[in-house]
């Protein structure tokens, strides 16, 4: 059974503790300047957006059938049995197909880096595999972000809507969108007002089904071996670059006494 997050925007107070907890868990810089940013980026995997007196989190939706994983030619993205959609930097060749395929515009790219990587929320896979909550759910002071089994969270969301019909829209965003996601959202207003795509636009069909239809149209005469050999070179070269960049970064941090 997939694990999931239930985010209830009606009890979110906009404290941004989820942002801070995420940054700490993923060794990301989080200071006043980062906290003030209102959009996601390669160094901010989740963001709490504000519209008047309403708040809304944006993060990777961890689709049950992730389009990003289906288009990745080297398997750098995959969904774990527990639910998180995770990223393997050692496999990534920087093609950015995942960015184009994501219905929720979640993967971000380190454009300014000499050794760029794709970045997004990975739902704390090590914690989840160990039976723990995600960092954002654990740190949330109001329970606006709750972690648990997807089926249980769906039932709880339905109960909340039934018991408080004047508080919530009669809708669980993520229940069926693109085949269902492991981030479920309850709200009093339209999530589309915060940048989420309309359900009617993305539909209920899992995105990989469209990927398969496109791949079926790829001509057989494409020189597959040149792609394979080229891919092997890129993967090998990529790993060397990643290792060198990480070593340089660690040396710089040690020299400057900084903590990331």
Over which residues does each language-model region extend?
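Non-ligating segments of multi-cofactor redox enzymes
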Residues: 1-260
